Amino acid sequence: MKKQHDTIIVLDFGSQYNQLIARRIREFGVYSELHPHTITAEEIKEINPKGIIFSGGPNSVYGEGALHCDEKIFDLGLPIFGICYGMQLMTQKFGGKVERANHREYGKAVLKVENESKLYANLPEEQVVWMSHGDLVTGLPEGFVVDATSESCPIAGMSNEAKNLYGVQFHPEVRHSEHGNDLIKNFVFGVCGCSEGWNMENFIEVELEKIRETVGDKKVLCALSGGVDSSVVAVLIHKAIGDQLTCIFVDHGLLRKGEAEGVMKTFSEGFHMNVIKVDAKERFMNKLKGVEDPEQKRKIIGNEFIYVFDDEASKLEGMDFLAQGTLYTDIVESGTATAQTIKSHHNVGGLPEDMQFKLIEPLNTLFKDEVRVLGSELGIPDEIVWRQPFPGPGLGIRVLGEITEEKLEIVRESDAILREEIIKAGLDREIWQYFTALPGMRSVGVMGDERTYDYTVGIRAVTSIDGMTADWARIPWDVLEKISVRIVNEVKHVNRIVYDVTSKPPATIEWE
């Protein structure tokens, strides 16, 4: 299929900010992909990008295990922009000098522009930027000039405009760099000559054609959860092939209040899709009886979901394709060799090997925020598009310890009150995620002149851009008070409310 847009590729050298670079570029209306630093020059030629960005990274170019790239990339004649480690790598390649700094520089710095190369066109001579480096460039490669300096960094920016090579020691992709977006824009449009052409309207048009070409007259199966990703996948594929799509919705009894009914109403009645609802509450609860360990709960829920889905899928004939809501973030993160497992991933793991489906993953080039935009373009209701991130194990990991029907009801009802009041206060678009959890501890209280010994409910609310890091949300006290009063008065067996004021890190967003 003919490519509809210009592309900038980002080579990943291990920076925690590498996804931000690609996202910033997409926000400009230009498509951007993240690739491992091991990509070859030949593979890049096949992609046919307009320019390349080398990301930052934690290594030293001279250190053991330093990451390098295919040197033939520099012979492609494409504009290259090196950020932090990327600039140091470029310096090393062209014979400049990189040394260990006297002390690691981390935080804001004032940048002074000394040479107005295309990268700094129409930008102020002084600007605040974000530094995060242990090495620095101390000697320019031949043919390069100093573009910018800072107090601790005599070569904070450099360029060889004859070869369209640029480097900066700071991180323009981070919002703390006040003109960072403009600087990246200057590279994308001013240096690479890109045109805007990446938007959801074009994406839908191209993706619908791709789905029709791939599927032909065959049938597609989709596991529908009611979450944003699976909902957008289902609606997009249904728009492409109509009744050739069948969705299976498994109600495992761990959903939020009104969620199961809402899914059936929206997709079966609203979009007129073929949705098979499976009531598996009893099956899941029997498997979870007496289980307290959070990892064990996750595995049981994940495995049982696969078995239920497998049972239902085997009843259907002629299903050739399986649709999944894999996002670009999932692909990028699954390729990170150094990532540690903090907890099993929320999404259900691999399907049984004997399920011989071909995969369709229409969202695998999109970030989460782009999926929401796509959902709105497809006419999916706001309550689904802006639905709170919800883990695959559902309320099962918001009841700490053993799961019982009574505990589930407490979390379900308290969570419904929290969501209702947050929406009433107009905070639902400001807060990334908010929910209640039941830590399993009881405390003494007094209600109606009588002593009580009931459960404590925890409220968790965080602000974030992508969920990788998060800060606790500063919900107004009067709103918190209203939520607390309502939960204690309306939810049985609760006499105390606590608010979680821990950021991520050190805590994770979910409690289990």
Swiss-Prot record:
GO terms for molecular function: ATP binding; GMP synthase activity. SUPFAM superfamilies: Adenine nucleotide alpha hydrolases-like, Class I glutamine amidotransferase-like, GMP synthetase C-terminal dimerisation domain. It is an enzyme of class 6 (ligase). It holds the Pfam family GATase. ATP binds at S225, G226, G227, V228, D229, S230, S231. The keyword Ligase applies. The keyword ATP-binding applies. GO terms for cellular component: cytosol. Keywords: ATP-binding, Glutamine amidotransferase, GMP biosynthesis, Ligase, Nucleotide-binding, Purine biosynthesis. It catalyses: XMP + L-glutamine + ATP + H2O = GMP + L-glutamate + AMP + diphosphate + 2 H(+). Pathway: Purine metabolism; GMP biosynthesis; GMP from XMP (L-Gln route): step 1/1. CDD domains: GATase1_GMP_Synthase, GMP_synthase_C. Residues 198-387 form the GMPS ATP-PPase domain. Residues 7-197 form the Glutamine amidotransferase type-1 domain. InterPro entries: Class_I_gatase-like (IPR029062), GATASE (IPR017926), GMP_synth_C (IPR001674), GMP_synth_GATase (IPR004739), GMP_synthase (IPR022955), GMPS_ATP_PPase_dom (IPR025777), NAD/GMP_synthase (IPR022310), Rossmann-like_a/b/a_fold (IPR014729). The active site is at C84 (nucleophile), H171, E173. Its EC number is 6.3.5.2. Catalyzes the synthesis of GMP from XMP. Homodimer. This is GMP synthase [glutamine-hydrolyzing].
